[in-house]
Curated annotation (Swiss-Prot):
Pfam families assigned to the protein according to its UniProt record, in alphabetical order: AlaE
Location relative to the cell: Cell inner membrane
Family under the similarity heading: Belongs to the AlaE exporter family.
InterPro entries for this protein: Ala_export_AlaE
Molecular function terms, GO-annotated: L-amino acid efflux transmembrane transporter activity
CC annotations in GO: plasma membrane
Cysteines engaged in disulfide bonds, as pairs: none
Function: Exports L-alanine.
TM segment ranges: 17-37, 48-68, 86-106, 111-131
Gene: alaE
Gene Ontology annotations of biological process type: amino acid export across plasma membrane
Alphabetical UniProt keywords: Amino-acid transport, Cell inner membrane, Cell membrane, Membrane, Transmembrane, Transmembrane helix, Transport
Keyword Transmembrane helix: yes
Protein name as annotated: L-alanine exporter AlaE
Length: 150
């Protein structure tokens, strides 16, 4: 986890890349295979989600880092980090996801099913997203996530 500090362009770029890629892939999976949306509805949803994810990626990264710090105050264990990742992901992403589905014309039943399924899947997905985000931050050489070569 990075230290709290000033805005870092590498951090924002890594957070944006991670959110756009991860949410596009996992969102299509949930919408088509679990929620019963058509491919066209899902593609419209995923296309609309790209600018939304670009807009919320860095704020989510800041929120996630805050949640990880709060979890670390309770316990420094990996289990607590995973719980903090899960809580951060579900509480931040669910409202945004519901709005995207509403805009693309999903029925109320599809929205409830998709968001509910997303909450259940997030029990695993939120943790995997945390690992994916950390890997992206390392790849983008975000301070605190990589070791510079001497």
């Amino acid at each position: 986890m990075s230290k709290k500090g000033p805005f870092n362009i590498r951090n924002a770029a890594a957070d944006t890349f991670a959110m756009v890629v991860f949410c596009f892939i996992t969102g299509m999976f949930i919408e088509i295979l679990i929620s019963g949306m058509t491919f066209e509805q899902s593609l419209a949803s995923r296309t609309l989600s790209i600018p939304v994810n670009i807009a919320i990626a860095w704020p989510y990264g800041v929120f996630r880092d805050f949640m990880l710090r709060q979890g670390a105050r309770i316990s420094p264990s990996k289990f607590m980090k995973n719980i903090a990742d899960l809580v951060a992901y579900v509480t931040f992403q669910s409202p945004a996801y519901a709005m995207i589905l509403l805009v693309v014309g999903a029925t109320p039943e599809q929205i409830i099913t998709a968001v509910s399924s997303n909450v259940v899947v997030s029990c695993v997905m939120g943790v995997f997203y945390g690992y994916f985000l950390d890997a992206c931050r390392k790849a983008f050489k975000v301070p605190g996530y990589y070791t510079p070569q001497a």
